[in-house]
Amino acid sequence: MEFLVSIEVGWPADGDPEELARLTAAERVRGAELGAAGTIRRMWRVPGRRANWGIWEAEDATALHAAIGSLPFYPYLDVEVIPLAAHPNDPERPGGR
């Protein structure tokens, strides 16, 4: 199942810079793992914000929640999830258009 996921990091202004650096490095590693596993399919940054939009794939909403919850920044994330359904005119879909 595919999901459109919006993530914004709400790091506190007075947060520890060393902890921020540690979490940033760990987040890159975990993000790469989720990408290699096919969970994160596509991702875009939002210019000027510490935010992104992505296409994620998981068996169901519970599996998606577990994947998002595995991100090191999870306690600081504002996440919005929109489940997606196939569209018959999707040009990337077999038989689409």
Feature-to-residue mapping (PLM):
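Conserved, structured core segments of small domains
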Residues: 1-97
